[in-house]
């Protein structure tokens, strides 16, 4: 069995790491390079950086941050936010990203996922899916969770896999920042529908929630922000807890 990964997520805006609840109410969590260094030392398997207010004016800022982090941190970095063209993927990879996450542009231009995967390989293309429960299914939202698309999240996941996404970063908007646990039904539905790895995101409040994400949600990796940024738990504690519960992790 492949080791399950623990991935701290750093939401970056204006050069700072922030954390919100349900995609709003952001509070400052610190300097990205310092935080990344700390996670590297604590044994994180990977780091995910999301430029959550990515626009043309701070696009270069995230490149500088990626370069600074990549020069100090030697675990895989996934970077997303504002990726609109294959050239953006190239720039992030050149800056030191190992994987590039595409979210809004995957919806507005699905061909981008295929073109990027064809050029750089599926292993470095992640599609981020922000999903919200609507009636009896989950709908995909874009633009940092502000825009409804009408797309069914499970069908969308299958389409993204078929276009070449090598991993899916799945966030439950209903659970984001609430610390009530992953939306396990959503995670499981998408895990069962595709063969590529699923990173579960949105809602971790306890270490048991991470175990549940893997066990019940069938996630390949669990992503968390608040519980790590504000010192409630350390990455090594999370790994030890998962190991005690029979989940294979890299210690």
From Swiss-Prot:
Enzyme class, first EC level, given as a word: lyase
Keyword Ribosomal protein carried by entry: no
Physiological role: IGPS catalyzes the conversion of PRFAR and glutamine to IGP, AICAR and glutamate. The HisF subunit catalyzes the cyclization activity that produces IGP and AICAR from PRFAR using the ammonia provided by the HisH subunit.
A molecular function GO annotation: imidazoleglycerol-phosphate synthase activity
Taxonomic lineage of the native organism: Bacteria, Pseudomonadati, Pseudomonadota, Betaproteobacteria, Nitrosomonadales
Superkingdom: Bacteria
GO annotation terms (biological process): L-histidine biosynthetic process
Subunit structure: Heterodimer of HisH and HisF.
Record-listed E.C. numbers: 4.3.2.10
Pfam families from the UniProt entry: His_biosynth
Subcellular location per the Swiss-Prot or TrEMBL entry: Cytoplasm
Pathway: Amino-acid biosynthesis; L-histidine biosynthesis; L-histidine from 5-phospho-alpha-D-ribose 1-diphosphate: step 5/9
Family listed: Belongs to the HisA/HisF family.
Gene Ontology CC: cytoplasm
Entry keyword set: Amino-acid biosynthesis, Cytoplasm, Histidine biosynthesis, Lyase
Protein name per the record: Imidazole glycerol phosphate synthase subunit HisF
Native source organism of the sequence: Thiobacillus denitrificans (strain ATCC 25259 / T1)
Catalytic activity as recorded in UniProt: 5-[(5-phospho-1-deoxy-D-ribulos-1-ylimino)methylamino]-1-(5-phospho-beta-D-ribosyl)imidazole-4-carboxamide + L-glutamine = D-erythro-1-(imidazol-4-yl)glycerol 3-phosphate + 5-amino-1-(5-phospho-beta-D-ribosyl)imidazole-4-carboxamide + L-glutamate + H(+)
